[in-house]
Structure formats: C-alpha cells, structure tokens
C-alpha cells in the first residue's frame, strides 16, 4: 500500500521531458552551478503546488520511520520502476537553489524548504543506496536554506532597513584602526550588498507569507534534527561546520519566552520555537556519533563566542557590534545558559574547551563599556562551572593577561575582577596547588589586579581601576563589602577603617608597603615607576587625585569618598581637605564629582563635624562658579541637604538624621563659617526667582525661632526675607521686643533679626516702624550694642526711614533727624577723650571703639551733617603714634610721601585697636569727602610703612584699595607702596594685599605699570604655600583671562628683572625704591630655583603661538645682545644667560603640539576624540616644521656664536648652553646636520665638544655614586667645609685652550664673591648630572691654622683632576706651616692676608682650576699634546722658567713624579712665557683656505696655566 501511494506521488517528479543530460550535469558540477530547468517541467511538477512536496513527503515518511514494514524496500521499488534517486536529488536541488536567491518569492522559498526536507528524508531512509544520495554540497545547501530562506530584516520598513545597513557599515568603519584604509575588497562587498538590497527591496512579504516561511523552516529543522542521530557526520567536517554556523544563527531567530533547558528540547513534539530547536541541534552535534567531542564543541564555542559578545553572527559577518537591545541581551543569556548546561552534562571533558572560550572572550570583547560589562558577567557565570583547580589556572592566566601591552585587555581584566568580587569567595581546595591557592581569594583581585592597574601608565586603565575600587566599596552585597574592607584593614592600607557595625578599627597609622616587600621588583612595562612607599593604597590614591588626566582624578575622588565613609575622619583630615579642595578643580567634571562626593560623604557621616565643615567650605562657594552646570550642581546639593530637610518644629525628631544634619550645617554657617554667608545670598537670589520658598516653608522656618535652633533659623530667615518677604510679622515683632529688652542678647541672633526687620520694614505698620526706630536709636546713643551689631542697626535704620518716607528728600530728612543725635553723641564722647587733659587716662577702650565705629557708619548715611571737627578728631587718633618718633622713614616712598608729616602730631598714644578702627572710619569719611582724601592718602601710605601693628596695616591696605576705586588717579601713584606689602612680614597682610590687588586689576582700576607685575608674580615663590597657591590662582584663572597676553608681554623683562640686570637699554628701567628692591630681590644662585619656578609657571600658561614667539624674542633680545657685543660679558651676564638657557631647555617652552603625545587610549564612545587626534597629528606636523625651520635659520647661528663668546670669556653659563645644545641636537639632529653641511669642520668640532661634555657628565655621576658608596658612617655627621664645583672649563671639549681656561677661573671667583655675596651663606642645591646647575664658582672658607684643609663630600661631583689638586694642597699645607708667597699672575686677582677669607677663596679656586688641566687623567683636545708641558711645583720663593718639553730616562722620570704634589706659581712681575708652537698643519690650510675669526679664536695657541 505504501509503495502504491509512493508511485502515485512520484509521478510529478518523473516528468517525461526531463533531460538526463541536465541531471548528469548537475551531479558532474557537484551542485555548484545549476543550469535553469525547463519551465514546462517546473510547471508540470508544481501543477498541484505545494501538494507535490507534501504528498511525496507523506509517502516517503513511513519508509524513514520503518512504519512500512521490512518486507517493502523503497530502493527496490526505485530500481524496478526505473526511478533514479539522482534525478530526484537534482530536482530537489533546483528548488533549493531558487530559494537561496534574495529575489525569490515567498512561494518559491517555501518550495525550497520542502525540497530540502525531502532530501533529508531520503537520507533518513535506511538502505545501502543512501551513500549515493548524499552529496556534501547539496547537504550544505539544504542546511543553509534554513537561514537564507528567511527574508533579511523583514520586520523593518524598507527605509529603516536601508538606514540600519548604512549605520552598521559606518559603525564598522569607525571601529577600524585609525590610519588603516579599508581594503578594495570591502568596497566591492559593499557594492554587492547594496545591489542585493536593491533587489530585495522589490520583494514584499505579507504577514501570512512570513508565517508560512517560518512554519516551513520550523518543520524542516525538526525533520533535520530527527535525521542527525541516525546520520553520522563523522567524516564530513565541512558539513558539521555548516550545521554549527546555521544553528548558531538560528539561535537568535526568535526569542524564547521561558527558561530554556536542553533536556526539554529532546522531545521535539513539545518544542515550539526555532531557537530551541537550534540549540538542540547544537547539542546533538556534540554526540560522539559525529566525531571527536572536543573538536565539535570547540567549533560550537567558537561560533557562540559572537553571540556571547553581542557581535554580528553569520556567514560573511564582519563581527561588528550589535546595538544592545533586550533581544540581543536575551540571546546572549541563552547562549551562556546553553554553554553552562553543556558543561554541566559533559563535566571534565569539556573544561579545556571552556577555558579556551573564556580566553577568547577576554581577547575579542568589544572595547566599549557596556559590551565589556556584559562580557565580564558572561565570563564569570561560565567560570563558576569550573572546579577550583581549573578556576585557579584560569585566574593565573587572567593575572598575566592584566599585564598585556594592549590597553583594552588591561581594562577588561578590571571588569572581570570586579565581577568576580560579587561572587562568594571560594574555599581552599586540596586539589589546588599551594602556589595557586592565592588565586581563589578576593584579596588577590583587589591587591594584585585592581591595585596594580591603579599604577598603570595609561590613564584610561588608571581611571577604570579606581572606579573599580569605588564600586568594590559601594557593593550592595554586605558580605562582599565587608570582605573588601577586611582586605584594607589587614593590609594596613588605610588607617582607621570602620566596619559595617560602625566600630572603628585602627591598625597601624603608618602607611607601610603592603606585604612588606619593595615595590621596585613589581614594576612592569605598563606600570608607572613606583617608589617603595607608593605601594600603599592611600599614597597611590593621593597621587592619582593629582593626576593630569581628568577621568583619573574623578575616579580617585570617588574612591576617596568611599574610603572616608568607612574611616575615622579624625585620622584622615588631610584627605578630607583634598576632597574639599577639588571643588575648585580646573576641570568641570571633576568639580561636579567633588561636589557629589562631599554630599554623599556628609550624608553617610551626618554627625561628623569635620565632614560638615568640609562640605560647607567645598560646596557653598561653588554657587559663584563661572560654569553654569557646576553652579546648578552646587545649588542642587544645597537644596538637597538644607532646604528639603526643613520641616515644622513639631515634626522635628532628633532621630531623623537628615533634619539634624540640616540644622547642624546651618548652625555652623551661623557661628563658625560666617564668611560663607555671602555666597548664600547668590543661592537664595537664584532660588527666589524660581519661587522656591513657599509660605509653608517660611512658616516652618519661623516655627524654629523660639527653639534652641533660633540662631540658624533667624539666619535662614534673613536670607529668605531678602527676596520673599511674605512672613508672619506678628511672630517676628514679638521675638524682637523680647530680645531687644535683654541686657546681653545673643549678637548673632539679634543681628539676623535686625536684618529681617530691615527687609520687611515696608510691610510693617507705621507705629511699629517708629517704635523699632526709637529702640535702635536709643541703643546706638547709649553704645549698648557690640560693634558686630552696629552695622546691622544702621542698615535697619536706613530701611525703616526709607519705608516711612515717600520721597528721597523725605528719607534724607528722616535720616538726619535720627542720625543727627547719634552723630552728636559720638562727637561729644570723642571730644571728651581727645581734647581734655585727662581724657585718655580714664577712657573705656571698648566704648571708644563702638563710638568710632558708629560714627563711621552714620557718616556714610548722612555725609552732609558731618562737620570738619569730626575729621580732626579721627585724625588726632591716628596722629598719636607710639612709634612714629623712632621708626626710620622709608627710602622707597615718593618725595611727597617723605615730606608727609603724621596726621596732626599729638603726644598721647592710642592703643592699636582704636587706631585700627579709626583708620576704617577715616576711610569711610574719605569716600564722602574728596578734600579729606587728598590729605589722608599720603599719611595712610606712610602709616602702612612705619606701623608695626598687623591690624593697622591691614586696615590701611583695605582703605587705600577702596579709595582707589573712588579716587583712581589719586591713589595710582601709591600702588608701588601697596605692592610692597606683598612681601610683608605677616602672611595675613601678604594674602590680603594679593586679594585686594587682584580685585583692582580685574576691574582695571589699577594697570600693570612699573614693577607691579614682577612683584605680583613673586608671590608664586612665597614662603607660605597657601599664598603661593593663591597667587597661582589669581594670575592664571582671574587676571590672565582678562589679559591673555599679559604673561607674554612681561616675560623677557622678567628675566632681566629677577636677575637685577640693569645694563640693557630697554628692559628693567622703571624706578624702584631701595627698600622695594631688597624685599623682592631674587638674584643670585640661591634664588635660582625660585626664578625658574616663576619662569615655568608663566610658560605653562602660554599659547603655542606665544611659546614660538617668545623663543625668538629671547634669542634676539637677550642672546643676540651678547653675541653682538651690545651687552658686556661679565658675571652678571653669566647669571642672566644661565637663566636664559635653562628656560630654553625647559619642557614648558616646547610647543604643546610637539610635546603632547597622541592619546592611544581614547574613551570608548568618544568618536569626536578620535577626530581630534587626527587633527592634532596634522597640526603637530605643520607646527613642527615651522618650529624647526625657525630654529635652524634664526636660533642655531646665535647659539653657535654665543658658544664661542662664552668659551673665549670663560663664562660659567657655558655649562647651561651645552645642556641646551645637547637637547636641541637630539630634537633637531637631521636639521642641524643639514645646517652644518656647508661647514663640516665646524660640525665635527661641535660633535666632539658634545661628546666630551657627555663624558664629563658621566664621569661626574660615576664619582658621585662612588663617593656615596664609599662614604663612612662618620662622614654623615660632618659639616662640609668646602663645596667644590664641577670642572667645566677644564674639559678640552669646551675650550681649545684648557690651561688658559683654568687661568680664568680665579677672576670669576673673585667677581662672583663681589657680585653675589648673598650666596655665600646658603649652600647650593644639589644638582643632577643630566641637568646641572650653574654653581660654577666654589665658596671656600679660610684654611685652618690648626690642621690641613679637609675636603668633604660636596653637593656636586668632583672630577679626577679636582681631587688630585686638592690632595696636593692638603699635603703641602700639612707639611709647611709657613706663609706662602704668590707670584705674578697673568690676570688680576686681589691678594690678601691668610686671615682674609676672600684671599683664600680666590687662591684656592685658582689652584683647583689650574691643576685640573695639568692632571693626566683629563682628556685632551684635538690639538692638545698628551703630556703636560712641564712639571709644576708648589713651594715658596721658586720662580718659573718655561722650557721645552724634555724626554727623561726612567730614573729621572720617577724622580720627577716624586714631586708631583708641588705646585709652582710665577712671580707677579713676570709675564708668562709662550708655549712652543706645534708643528701641525690643517689640510684645509694647505689649500689656502682661511678659517673664520671666530674659529681662530677658539683654536688659539696654548697658554701656560700660571
């Protein structure tokens, strides 16, 4: 029966007109190329449509499932009826191939799926002929139709599909490595895909079509899975690979709504989703039937990798990242779940393959934050399936991976470590080796992976590591959080950490290196060089907080906040201050992070007063930030902690931490941090515009005025009423009446109350206003209130009078009426004290202060009623100076100031506190009366210089600066006197002057004239670090913004000014007083570091254009002046040139475009940053070429010429020139070679000079190291008796005549001693060989008569020749205790007695320098003989006679060497003999060429050293 049905259903598939040749061709071509089938035959087959496939399938199905019985054989039936299986397969292939086309209709796609199902059914039928039916290409096509028959992205509109394709390609191109253009093949593939898309756009699929195709795919897949267990693919690896690719692609075909388990998919009849069938197909492929397990599983995992990493999957896929949607995430979760199930079932056999998968996840994860996070979660989830031994092995590999040279690898390791920390810690297992047991502990992830990455050289990695630390400490799992804290505690990483039970754990406060070993052995190529102490967590964190990269600082602040949450704040107040200071960080995002961190910290520790104060000092001033987003963040933090927690006092609960915190903060603002209240005015003004203060809120504040929180409540009301005066006035007036009657009211509360009354005055009834006015007037008349309340009282009086008056004139009349009596009382009281004989003897100091203060405030309100008598009274107070008689007059004042007498001389002496208040009052009077100001300003300036009282000087500065706004021209002449206060002995005065001058300069009341700029920038090197920091802020962030060229315009003159060089015709020519010069003196070697700090600060804030121009200006205005002989070459010039070359050699003067490294670790999602890098590289190339051209054409010629001049004059600045020349020869080697191409001899000389100079530096460094290594313990307690400068001039590479060079050392020493005596008492700072200082001239004390001179270890290394000559001097002095006589020298040296230290300094300098050149160790120049000209002795009364070099026998030579420690000097009346000329001819001269005068000067004949 089955065979009969089969015969009927096979009829359409056995058309009579079918060409056997066509069938043969299909098989011969291995199904790769199929010729079109005759349409009539196709029509004959499809006459019944889909039934042709389904009926044949129904007929064949019983034979595949053995339902037809064993008596019937389909293959026998085929043979008997002459039915060819090859023909059937060829016809099936035709329909399969048609369905593969993108232009295929829904019907043909369905036909193709059915045809593939018939082919699989033939393979399923048992029998020997099955091997003839199978063909690998046909098999693969039938499998691939499962994927290709489904219309691509059919659920999208055509436009959306086109846009997505374009976007996907764009994203792929963006993800390509920069600088690597797409290949030609990529463009060709793009063209093909574009054509295919256009073809596909013409096809429309209805919902019904899609459902039919989906059902056909489902049925075909189910049938194929029924075939897989029966049909082995063991010998068909390509078919297995095709199956895996198709199955993996189908896993994301449709979502699986329920939790997927492989065991459920084994019953195919119960499976409803294609994705489930695909996973079951992958599971079936893992059967031993299809080959070696691990190979197949490895291929499956390889394909599943893209699903897990959320990349494109499929044939021809470029593995571009997919948009992260819920469907993509679900596919990832299902893939991880499948791999986990497979590992659970196969156990140990699959562990190696799983390890490979985990490694590939690490290596191929997309370098974007979200992809990394999901990949790390997947990896950790799979890692839990491994037993401890394999787990530890993988962690060991991960640890090595964390030290990869690629930044994305190191970043992803941190994601993995963070994910692993969320898991419970594994217990130790006996199967794990001892060396691998550490990998099971959380401590390893924290200390060995995350901590080490905090020291990474890449800022992206450092930032990620710090963020990981912060996340560790904020983990929601209490167990994990405790374990992290436990790691810190046990490692002594952080002092005073609190555990979660709020108990304070205080390990050793000493921050030691963790694990007790040195960090130097742990450094890696990807890590920064760390010192032994930097392995401590807090040391590292403090360094990261100062990191140059913004994201690193942000992350470090997060970590610091997390640490402080769990710490004893009292032991970490310095770190709390760091968090506070970063609210003013230059970077906007860092400021926001600091605000957020401080807010979170104060909410975590609401009862900690230091944290509360830090929050106030950090957050409140930021409401004035110039960046609106930062300002909004600060307002948000204030609103969150202050306003939102203010409730009615009936709802106040001490257990409510937020309410308690709000009132605690307000109380601190009221009492301790009153200076911050001015910033609150800005905040409340902004809030009032937003209608922030409702009547409910205001009434809630008022309800606290009668509680213990009254002072902060009144303070808050004073801010609110300024903008929202809708208050319950009755309650306020009642409180006023009660408090005003008290004998000693609280000053703070009463002051705020007066402020509130002033704001609501216009809303009060007239009777109430008059009553309050009377009370205030009476209190002022009786001086019953403290000075703190006087200003508030006067302000309240003014507002009350304004509220009572209808016009301005009426207001003035009321003020005169009210204030006139108070003013008269003050005048009478002062007259009684100052004009009566015994007035000062019985005066009440506090009462006088109140009187003076009241008078000043009243005078400002009513200047018309103030009589001249009041002026005289105030002036008489100031005239009574207790120190005006004995203090010398300042030398730095103008003639008018010198002749200015004290205000009005008087014999009485007033206390300083009264004089200080009198100055403030005088300033208020001067603001209203110009004539008084003209008389008072010179006297005030005089007082500024002679007064010893800090309060008096401070008030004088404030008054003069205020008067500068009112009378700018009048005060302008005295700005130099004010700027002198920048060097006042008191730090407070210096800081006050700095702030006031900054304000005046910002508003342009004061101009940068004369010495003001140079005095202002000298604050950068103030001895007080806070003042230096404030100076930096004022200059860089306030003043430079108003005048961007300010630094550039003054830079050249800075070099002259700070070296006190006044020989230039243009620079440093402004007038200065001697006192000012001495106060701001920065010349000399001792101040070299300070000067360089100023120069570098200015250069750091130059633009690249300014750096380029200032380099040229330095060469033209400084260096060229010396090469052209405009300026004299002397010791003053040496200091100036030394500074100049150090500036040119500094990294700060190099163009940013040239010294900035292209960022290799851009932020992941920042495509704009990538474009910026490309622009930066192009800009750098252009600027570099311009800079190099300018350098070669304009700078190098000047440098070379100046080198010759310095060598000729033996100037110590030659050392700095050589340093600079060495650097530029490295930076511009090719350009310099081109420059010297025309003068190869000069080039060889310069190269030789540099070689010898480098050798000398290396020799000095070696000697220093040797001296440090051999120095005995007793040497450390000795005080060095001599500081020996390095031997610069003795090196033949720097001078053609080395002995003449040594001879020039003594006048330099003498000149230095005369010009820079301020350096004698200060030891020179230690210098490094790579960047030596210009400490050329040694300073030696006189030789002791009791013993030989002892040379101790100096701060600078000594050459071998120096050591030799000093040893000779020591021996000579020890053996001959008698007076030495000096012969005539070929240059002028001041001689003196042995008791004169300067005499010894000069002579010893001479001896030291001269012997350096004689010593045989010294390297010789090109034209210098190897042996010395003659032996030199050191003895009295022996004259020198020059003789030609003589060759001795061995005995005579040994005899000569016995006296080698004797030095002989010529007599004063003798001229040194000329040395013999060397018979050496230059090849260049032999051809008649003449050398330049400059070169002939360099190669002068040798002179004798004496």
Swiss-Prot record:
Biased composition, class Polar residues, residue ranges:
884-897, 1324-1338
User: Which residue ranges does the record annotate as region Disordered?
Assistant: 154-194, 884-908, 1317-1353, 1385-1412, 1473-1506
**Source organism, top-level taxon:** Eukaryota
UniProt lists compositionally biased (Basic residues) regions at: 1492-1506
| Gene Ontology CC annotations of this record | condensed chromosome; condensed nuclear chromosome; condensin complex; germinal vesicle; kinetochore
- Keywords attached to this entry: Cell cycle, Cell division, Coiled coil, DNA condensation, Mitosis, Nucleus, Phosphoprotein, Repeat
HEAT repeat ranges are 442-476, 532-567, 574-605, 968-1004
**Where would you find this protein in the cell?**
Nucleus
Q: Which residues carry this modification: Phosphoserine?
A: 562, 1359, 1368, 1381, 1393
Biased composition annotated in UniProt, kind: Low complexity: 1393-1405
Claim: Protein biosynthesis is one of the keywords in the record:
no
- List the GO biological process terms: cell division; meiotic chromosome separation; mitotic chromosome condensation; positive regulation of chromosome condensation; positive regulation of chromosome segregation; positive regulation of chromosome separation
> Coiled-coil segments, which residues?
1213-1270
On assembly, the entry states:
Component of the condensin-2 complex, which contains the SMC2 and SMC4 heterodimer, and 3 non SMC subunits that probably regulate the complex: NCAPH2, NCAPD3 and NCAPG2.
Please describe what this protein does: Regulatory subunit of the condensin-2 complex, a complex which establishes mitotic chromosome architecture and is involved in physical rigidity of the chromatid axis. May promote the resolution of double-strand DNA catenanes (intertwines) between sister chromatids. Condensin-mediated compaction likely increases tension in catenated sister chromatids, providing directionality for type II topoisomerase-mediated strand exchanges toward chromatid decatenation. Specifically required for decatenation of centromeric ultrafine DNA bridges during anaphase.
Name by which UniProt lists this protein? Condensin-2 complex subunit D3
């Amino acid at each position: 029966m089955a065979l009969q049905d089969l015969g009927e259903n096979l009829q359409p598939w056995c058309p009579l007109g079918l060409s056997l040749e066509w069938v043969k061709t299909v098989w011969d071509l291995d199904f790769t190329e199929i010729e079109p089938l005759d349409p009539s035959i196709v029509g004959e087959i499809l006459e019944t449509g889909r039934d042709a496939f389904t009926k044949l399938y129904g007929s064949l199905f019983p034979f595949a499932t053995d339902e037809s019985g064993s008596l019937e054989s389909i293959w026998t039936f085929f043979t008997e009826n002459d039915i060819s299986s090859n023909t059937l397969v060829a016809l099936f292939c035709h329909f399969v191939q048609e369905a593969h086309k993108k232009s295929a209709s829904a019907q043909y796609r369905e036909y193709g799926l059915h045809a593939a199902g018939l082919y699989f059914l033939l393979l399923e039928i048992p029998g020997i002929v099955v091997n003839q039916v199978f063909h690998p290409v046909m098999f693969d096509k039938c499998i691939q139709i499962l994927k290709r028959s489904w219309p691509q992205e059919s659920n999208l509109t055509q436009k959306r599909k086109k846009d997505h394709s374009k976007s996907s390609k764009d994203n792929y191109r963006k993800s390509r490595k920069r600088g690597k253009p797409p290949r030609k093949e990529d463009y060709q593939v793009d063209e093909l895909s574009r054509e295919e898309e256009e073809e596909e756009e013409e096809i429309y699929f209805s919902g019904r079509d899609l459902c039919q195709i989906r059902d056909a795919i489902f049925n075909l897949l189910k049938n194929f899975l029924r075939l897989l267990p029966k049909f082995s693919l063991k010998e068909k690896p390509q078919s297995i690979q095709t199956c895996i690719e198709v199955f993996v692609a189908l896993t994301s075909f449709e979502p699986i709504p329920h939790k997927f388990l492989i065991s459920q998919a084994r019953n195919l009849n119960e499976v409803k989703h294609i994705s489930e069938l695909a996973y079951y197909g992958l599971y079936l492929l893992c059967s031993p039937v299809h080959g070696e397990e691990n190979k197949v599983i490895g291929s499956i995992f390889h394909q599943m990798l893209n699903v897990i990493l959320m990349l494109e999957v499929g044939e021809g896929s470029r593995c571009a990242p997919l948009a992260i949607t819920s469907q993509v995430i679900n596919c990832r979760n299902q893939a991880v779940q499948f791999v986990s199930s497979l590992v659970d079932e196969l156990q140990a056999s699959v562990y190696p393959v799983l390890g490979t998968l985990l490694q590939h996840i690490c290596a191929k994860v997309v370098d974007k934050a979200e992809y990394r996070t999901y990949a790390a979660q997947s990896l950790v989830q799979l890692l839990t399936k491994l037993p401890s031994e394999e787990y530890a092995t993988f962690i060991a590999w991960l640890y090595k991976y964390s030290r990869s040279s690629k930044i994305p690898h190191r970043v992803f390791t941190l994601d993995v470590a963070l994910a692993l920390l969320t898991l419970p810690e594994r217990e130790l297992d006996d199967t794990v080796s001892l060396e691998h047991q550490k990998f099971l502990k959380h401590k390893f992830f924290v200390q060995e992976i995350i901590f080490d990455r905090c020291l990474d050289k890449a800022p992206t990695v450092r930032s990620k590591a710090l963020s990981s630390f912060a996340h560790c400490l904020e983990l929601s799992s209490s167990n994990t959080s405790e374990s992290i804290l436990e790691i810190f505690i046990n490692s002594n990483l952080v002092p005073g950490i609190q555990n979660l039970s709020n108990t304070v754990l205080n390990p050793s406060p000493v921050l030691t290196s963790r694990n007790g070993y040195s960090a130097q052995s742990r450094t890696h190529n990807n890590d920064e060089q760390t010192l032994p102490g930097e392995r401590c967590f807090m040391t590292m964190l403090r360094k990261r907080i100062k990191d140059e990269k913004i994201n690193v600082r942000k992350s470090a602040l997060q970590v610091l906040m997390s640490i402080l949450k769990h710490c004893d704040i009292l032991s970490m107040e310095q770190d709390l201050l760091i968090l506070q200071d970063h609210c003013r960080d230059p970077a906007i995002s860092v400021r926001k992070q600091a605000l957020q961190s401080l807010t979170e910290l104060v909410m975590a520790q609401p009862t900690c007063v230091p944290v509360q104060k830090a929050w106030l000092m950090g957050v409140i001033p930021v409401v004035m930030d110039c960046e609106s987003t930062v300002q909004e963040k600060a307002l948000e933090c204030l609103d969150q902690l202050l306003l939102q927690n203010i409730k009615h006092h009936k709802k106040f609960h001490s257990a409510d931490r937020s309410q308690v915190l709000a009132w605690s903060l307000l109380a601190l603002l009221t009492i301790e941090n009153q200076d911050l209240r001015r910033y609150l005015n800005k905040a409340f003004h902004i809030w009032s515009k937003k209608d922030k203060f409702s009547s409910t809120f205001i009434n809630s504040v008022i309800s606290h005025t009668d509680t213990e929180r009254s002072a902060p409540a009144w303070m808050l009301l004073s801010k609110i009423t300024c903008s929202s005066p809708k208050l319950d006035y009755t309650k306020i007036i009642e409180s006023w009446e009660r408090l005003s009657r008290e004998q000693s009211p609280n000053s703070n509360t009463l002051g705020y109350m007066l402020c509130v009354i002033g704001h609501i005055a216009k809303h009060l009834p007239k009777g109430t206003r008059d009553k309050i006015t009377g009370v205030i007037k009476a209190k002022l008349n009786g001086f019953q209130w403290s000075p703190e309340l006087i200003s508030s009282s006067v302000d309240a009086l003014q507002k009350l009078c304004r509220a009572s008056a209808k016009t301005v004139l009426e207001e003035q009349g009321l003020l005169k009426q009210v204030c006139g009596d108070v003013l008269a009382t003050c005048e009478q009281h002062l007259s009684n004290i100052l004009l009566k004989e015994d007035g000062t003897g019985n005066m009440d100091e506090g009462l006088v202060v109140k009187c003076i203060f009241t008078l000043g405030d009243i005078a400002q309100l009513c200047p018309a009623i103030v009589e001249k008598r009041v002026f005289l009274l105030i002036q008489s107070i100031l005239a009574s100076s207790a120190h005006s008689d004995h203090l010398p007059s300042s030398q730095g004042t103008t003639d008018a100031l010198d002749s200015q007498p004290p205000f009005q001389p008087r014999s009485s002496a007033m206390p300083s506190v009264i004089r200080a208040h009198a100055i403030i009052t005088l300033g208020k009077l001067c603001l209203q009366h110009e004539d008084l100001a003209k008389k008072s300003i010179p006297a005030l300036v005089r007082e500024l210089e002679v007064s010893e009282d800090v309060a008096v000087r401070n008030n004088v500065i404030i008054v003069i600066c205020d008067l500068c706004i009112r009378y700018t021209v009048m005060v302008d002449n005295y700005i130099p006197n004010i700027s002198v206060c920048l060097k006042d002995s008191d730090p407070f005065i210096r800081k006050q002057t700095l702030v006031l001058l900054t304000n005046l300069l910002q508003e342009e009341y004061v101009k940068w004239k004369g010495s003001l700029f140079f005095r202002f920038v000298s604050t950068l090197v103030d001895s007080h670090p806070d003042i230096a920091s404030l100076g930096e802020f004022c200059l860089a962030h306030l003043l430079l913004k108003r005048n961007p060229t300010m630094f550039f315009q003054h830079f050249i003159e800075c070099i002259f000014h700070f070296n006190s060089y006044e020989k230039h015709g243009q620079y440093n020519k402004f007038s200065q007083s001697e006192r000012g010069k001495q106060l701001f003196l920065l010349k000399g070697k001792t101040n070299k570091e300070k000067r360089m700090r100023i120069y570098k600060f200015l250069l750091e804030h130059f633009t690249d254009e300014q750096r380029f121009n200032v380099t040229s200006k330095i060469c033209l205005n400084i260096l060229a002046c010396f090469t052209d002989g405009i300026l004299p070459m002397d010791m003053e010039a040496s200091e100036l040139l030394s500074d100049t070359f150090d500036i040119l050699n500094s990294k700060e003067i190099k163009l940013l475009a040239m010294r900035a490294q292209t960022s290799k670790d851009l932020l992941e999602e920042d495509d704009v940053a990538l474009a910026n890098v490309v622009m930066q590289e192009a800009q750098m190339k252009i600027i570099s070429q311009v800079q190099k051209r300018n350098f070669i054409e304009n700078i190098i010629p000047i440098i070379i010429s100046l080198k010759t001049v310095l060598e000729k004059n033996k100037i110590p600045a030659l050392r700095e020139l050589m340093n600079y020349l060495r650097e530029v020869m490295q930076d511009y080697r090719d350009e310099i070679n081109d420059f010297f191409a025309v003068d190869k001899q000069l080039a060889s000389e310069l190269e030789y000079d540099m070689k010898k100079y480098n050798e000398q530096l290396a020799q000095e460094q070696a000697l220093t190291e040797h001296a440090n290594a051999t120095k005995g313990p007793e040497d450390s307690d000795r005080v060095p008796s001599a500081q020996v400068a390095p031997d610069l001039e003795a090196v033949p590479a720097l001078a053609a005549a080395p002995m003449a060079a040594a001879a020039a050392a003594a006048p330099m020493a003498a000149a230095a001693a005369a010009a820079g005596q301020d350096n004698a008492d200060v030891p020179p700072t230690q210098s490094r060989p790579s960047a030596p200082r210009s400490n050329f001239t040694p300073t030696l004390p006189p030789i002791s008569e009791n013993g030989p001179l002892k040379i101790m270890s100096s701060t600078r290394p000594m050459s071998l020749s120096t050591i030799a000559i000093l040893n000779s001097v020591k021996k000579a002095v020890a053996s001959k205790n008698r007076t030495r006589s000096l012969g005539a020298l070929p240059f002028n040296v001041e001689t003196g007695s042995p008791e004169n230290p300067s005499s010894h300094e000069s002579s010893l300098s001479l001896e030291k320098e001269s012997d350096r050149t004689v010593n045989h160790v010294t390297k010789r120049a090109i034209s210098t003989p190897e042996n010395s000209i003659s032996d030199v002795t050191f003895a009295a009364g022996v004259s020198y006679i020059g003789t030609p070099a003589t060759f001795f026998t061995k005995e005579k030579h040994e005899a000569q060497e016995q006296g080698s420690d004797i030095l002989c000097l010529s007599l004063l009346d003798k001229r040194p003999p000329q040395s013999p000329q060397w018979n050496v001819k230059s090849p260049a001269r032999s051809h008649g060429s003449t050398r330049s005068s400059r070169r002939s000067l360099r190669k002068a004949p040798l002179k004798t050293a004496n």
